[in-house]
C-alpha cells in the first residue's frame, strides 16, 4: 500500500480572516531623571528589569522580559492570566522569542532544554516530543495556547509563531483544569503579537546534514492609536538531519490579529502546520531483554527507511477581555483544532547483546478534533485593610478521537541489526484495529470545571494568601474500533482545593508555599500494550511546595522544595497498560538568571529528584526509582558580549543528566551524560536606515557525545541522543 492511497489531501489553506473589533488606549508611564543626575552618572550604565507600562497582572499581555529579553520572570497561570512570579505562590518562568532566535531553537524541546526542571523525552515508538516536568510525564499535545487547552499542533510544535514558551512547575488543575497530562507541570505557548515598532524580518537557515529553510515574520499596527495589529509568520524547511537518512520537512503559516481598545481587548489566531518525518531513528524496543545495549555509532540510523509520519494541524482561537468597570474585567476565549496523523512506524525490538533485532510494523491513521473554551470575571476590591483579587470562571474541553491501526505479526517480522542495519521489506499486516481508511470514533474525552479563587493581601500586599477551588468533572469513554460500541468508560468529579501564601520580607525577596491538587484524564496506552490507544483512566494527584524567589534587578532566581503524589501507570502481566501503582516525587529545584556583570549573562538551573514507586504488583518494586527519572539534572547557559566588536556575542550551554533506570526493577541502568553547545552571533547595521542583519552559527553536542538520553514511562523504548549538529542562520530586518 502506498502512502498516497491512504493519506487524504489537506491543501494549505491560505485564508486570512479579518477581525474587526473596537479601540485601545495604552497607558505609558515615563520615568525621567533630571539633568543633574544624568550628568553625574553619564559614564555609568544602569541595567535593571523594568516592567512594561501596559502590563496588568491577570491579563493577556505577557510579563515583561528580564534584562536582555531571553527570560521572563513569570508567565500565564491558566485562567488567572499572566502573573509576575514574585507575586504568586507557584513556580513559573518564561522563555522569549529572542531566546528562540538567538539559540536557533526550532521546536519546543530546543527551548525547554534550557530548564533543568523539564526533561525532553521522545514519544512512544514515533517522533513525538514529550517531556517530564518534575519527573512526571507531560504529553506535548497537552500544552496550552494562551492558556487554552487542546489548541497546539500534535507531537512536534514549530517555534516560529511563538512569543513565549512558559513553564509552570507543579500540579495545576485550579489554573489549567481542562488540560490532560500536566500532573508535574504545564507548558504554555504565547503567540506573537504586532508591536508598536513594525516588524519585517526574513531569514534563511541551515542545519546539518542538509536541512535548509526560509522564514518570514511581518508585523504592524494600524489606526490612530495603533489599536489594530497583525502578525504573520511563514516557514518552510526540509532536508536530512545529522543522522543518516533522517529526512524532515516543516511547513508553517500563522496569522495573529489583535485589537487594543480603551475598555476592550481582543485577538484572533489561526495557524496551519505540517510536519513530515521519513526514515528517522525511533526508540529501540528493549522490553524483551534484561540489559541496556551498547550504543550504535552516533550518526548510524537503525530504523528502516520506509518508516514515516505525516502530521497535519489546523487551529484557530478567539480571545476577548472587556473592562466592565474600573478593576473589574470579563474575559472569554474559544478555540478549535483539527489534527490528522498518518504513519508507518517501525521500532526495532532487540533480541540479544549482539544487536540483533526484529523490525516490526505498525500503521496508524488518526483524526483528532478538539474544542476548548473558558469564560469568567476577575476583579479587585478591599474589605477594610485587606485587599482582594478574585476570579470566577468556567472552562471546558472536548476531544473526539478516531484511530485505526494495522500491524504485523511478531513471527513475520524480519531480522535486522541495530549496529549494522540492512534495509528489509516491510512485513505484511496481520492484525487490524478498525477500518484503516475510515476510522470510527475510538475515544471521547470531556473535561469541565468551575474556578473560584481569591488572593487576599495585607500590610500593603507584603503578605498574600491565595485560596481557590475548582470543581472538576472528567468523562473518558473508549469505543471498539471495529463495531463503534462503547467498550469502557470513566467518570469522576470532585472539588480540588488550592491554597498558597507569599510573604515579602523585603522588596527583592518572596517566600512562598502552596498545596495543589489535580484531576485529569490519564495518558493513552503505548503501541507496545495490548490495549494500545485506550485511556488509562482518571488521575488524582496532590502537591506540596515551599520556596523562595529573588529579584535583585540585574539577577534573579528561585529555590523550591516539593513533593508530588500520583497514581502510576505501567504494563501488567497481560501487557495491559493501566494505573497499577503509585509514585511519589520529592525534589529540590534551583534557578538563576540575569546579568551579574555587564556583558555576561547567565541562565542556570538544577534539579535534585527522588522519584519513588509504591503499591507495585505484590510490592516487588516498592521503594524503587521510577522509570526514566534521573536523580540530578543541571543546565548552565552563558553569553558574553565580546568587546570592542560591537554586536559580537559568544554563547555556551552545558546540559548534564544523572543516571536513570529503564525498568521498575531498576536492573536496566542508563548511564549519565553531559553535552556542550557552543555558538556565536554577530549583529550589524547595514545602512543609515538602521536595517539590521544578524548572523548566527552554533554547534550542538560539540564533543559528539554518544549517549542514551532516556526511556519512555513504560520502559519499552530506549532513546538515543542527538549527534553533533551544525546550524547557521542569517536574519535580515528591514
Q: What are the residue ranges of the model-derived segments?
A:
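Conserved C-terminal beta-signal and adjacent last beta-strands/turns
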Residues: 20, 390, 513, 544, ...
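Gram-negative outer-membrane beta-barrel transporters
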Residues: 460, 563-565, 579-664, 731-733
Amino acid at each position: 500500500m502506498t502512502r498516497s492511497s491512504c493519506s487524504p489531501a489537506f491543501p494549505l489553506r491560505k485564508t486570512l480572516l479579518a477581525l474587526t473589533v473596537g479601540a485601545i488606549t495604552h497607558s505609558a508611564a515615563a520615568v525621567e531623571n533630571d539633568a543633574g543626575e544624568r550628568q553625574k552618572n553619564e559614564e555609568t550604565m544602569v541595567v535593571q528589569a523594568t516592567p512594561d507600562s501596559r502590563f496588568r497582572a491577570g491579563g493577556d499581555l505577557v510579563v515583561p522580559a528580564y534584562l536582555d529579553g531571553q527570560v521572563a520572570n513569570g508567565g500565564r497561570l491558566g485562567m488567572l492570566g499572566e502573573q509576575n512570579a514574585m507575586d504568586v505562590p507557584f513556580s513559573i518562568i518564561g522563555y522569549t522569542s529572542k531566546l528562540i532566535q538567538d539559540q536557533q531553537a526550532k521546536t519546543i524541546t530546543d527551548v525547554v532544554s534550557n530548564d533543568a526542571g523539564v526533561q525532553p523525552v521522545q514519544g512512544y515508538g514515533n517522533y513525538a516530543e514529550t517531556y517530564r516536568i518534575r519527573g512526571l510525564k507531560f504529553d506535548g499535545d497537552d500544552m496550552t495556547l494562551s492558556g487554552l487547552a487542546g489548541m497546539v499542533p500534535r507531537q512536534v510544535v514549530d517555534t516560529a509563531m511563538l512569543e513565549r514558551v512558559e513553564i509552570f512547575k507543579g500540579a495545576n488543575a485550579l489554573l489549567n483544569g481542562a488540560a490532560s497530562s500536566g500532573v508535574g507541570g504545564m507548558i504554555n505557548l504565547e503567540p506573537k503579537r504586532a508591536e508598536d515598532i513594525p516588524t519585517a524580518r526574513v531569514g534563511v537557515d541551515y542545519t546539518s546534514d542538509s536541512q535548509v529553510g526560509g522564514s518570514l515574520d511581518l508585523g504592524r499596527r494600524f489606526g490612530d492609536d495603533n489599536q489594530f495589529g497583525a502578525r504573520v509568520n511563514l516557514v518552510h524547511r526540509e532536508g536530512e538531519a545529522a543522522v543518516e537518512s533522517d529526512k524532515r520537512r516543516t511547513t508553517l503559516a500563522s496569522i495573529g490579529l489583535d485589537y487594543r481598545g480603551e475598555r476592550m481587548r481582543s485577538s484572533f489566531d489561526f495557524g496551519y502546520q505540517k510536519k513530515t518525518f521519513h526514515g528517522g531513528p525511533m526508540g529501540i524496543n528493549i522490553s524483551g531483554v534484561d540489559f541496556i545495549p551498547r550504543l550504535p555509532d552516533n550518526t548510524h540510523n537503525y530504523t528502516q527507511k520506509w518508516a514515516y509520519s505525516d502530521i497535519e494541524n489546523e487551529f484557530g482561537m478567539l480571545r476577548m477581555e472587556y473592562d466592565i468597570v474600573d478593576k473589574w474585567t470579563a474575559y472569554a476565549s474559544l478555540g478549535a483544532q483539527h489534527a490528522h496523523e498518518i504513519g508507518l512506524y517501525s521500532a526495532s525490538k532487540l533480541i540479544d547483546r549482539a544487536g540483533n533485532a526484529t523490525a516490526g510494523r505498525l500503521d496508524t491513521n488518526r483524526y483528532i478534533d478538539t474544542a476548548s473554551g473558558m469564560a469568567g470575571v476577575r476583579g479587585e476590591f478591599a474589605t477594610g485593610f485587606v485587599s482582594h483579587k478574585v476570579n470566577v470562571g468556567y472552562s471546558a474541553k472536548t476531544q473526539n478521537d478516531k484511530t485505526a491501526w494495522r500491524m504485523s505479526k511478531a513471527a513475520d517480522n524480519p531480522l535486522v541489526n541495530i549496529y549494522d542495519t540492512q534495509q528489509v521489506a516491510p512485513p505484511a499486516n496481520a492484525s487490524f484495529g478498525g477500518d484503516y481508511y475510515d476510522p470510527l470514533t475510538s475515544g471521547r474525552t470531556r473535561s469541565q470545571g468551575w474556578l473560584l479563587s481569591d488572593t487576599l493581601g495585607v500590610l500593603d500586599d507584603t503578605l498574600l494568601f491565595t485560596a481557590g477551588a475548582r470543581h472538576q468533572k472528567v468523562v473518558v469513554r473508549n469505543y471498539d474500533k471495529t463495531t463503534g460500541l462503547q467498550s469502557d468508560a470513566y467518570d469522576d468529579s470532585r472539588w480540588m482545593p488550592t491554597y498558597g501564601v507569599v510573604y515579602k520580607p523585603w522588596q527583592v525577596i518572596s517566600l512562598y508555599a502552596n498545596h495543589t491538587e489535580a484531576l485529569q484524564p490519564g495518558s493513552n496506552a503505548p503501541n507496545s500494550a495490548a490495549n494500545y490507544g485506550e485511556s488509562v483512566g482518571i488521575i488524582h494527584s496532590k502537591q506540596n511546595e515551599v520556596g523562595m524567589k529573588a529579584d535583585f534587578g540585574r539577577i534573579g532566581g528561585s529555590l523550591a522544595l516539593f513533593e508530588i503524589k500520583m497514581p502510576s501507570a505501567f504494563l501488567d502481566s497481560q501487557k495491559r497498560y493501566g494505573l497499577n501503582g503509585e509514585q511519589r516525587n520529592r525534589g529540590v529545584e534551583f534557578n538563576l538568571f540575569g546579568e551579574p556583570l555587564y556583558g555576561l549573562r547567565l541562565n542556570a538551573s538544577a534539579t535534585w529528584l527522588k522519584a519513588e514507586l509504591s503499591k507495585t504488583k505484590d510490592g516487588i518494586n516498592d521503594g524503587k526509582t521510577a522509570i526514566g527519572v534521573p536523580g540530578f539534572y543541571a543546565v548552565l547557559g552563558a553569553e558574553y558580549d565580546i568587546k570592542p566588536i560591537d554586536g559580537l556575542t559568544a554563547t555556551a550551554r552545558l546540559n548534564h543528566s544523572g543516571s536513570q533506570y529503564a525498568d521498575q526493577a531498576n536492573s536496566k541502568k542508563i548511564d549519565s551524560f553531559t553535552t556542550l553547545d557552543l555558538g556565536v552571533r554577530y549583529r550589524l547595521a547595514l545602512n543609515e536606515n538602521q536595517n539590521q542583519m544578524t548572523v548566527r552559527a552554533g554547534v550542538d553536542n560539540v564533543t559528539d557525545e554518544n549517549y542514551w538520553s532516556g526511556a519512555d514511562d513504560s520502559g519499552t523504548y530506549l532513546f538515543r541522543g542527538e549527534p553533533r549538529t551544525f546550524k547557521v542562520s542569517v536574519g535580515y530586518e528591514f
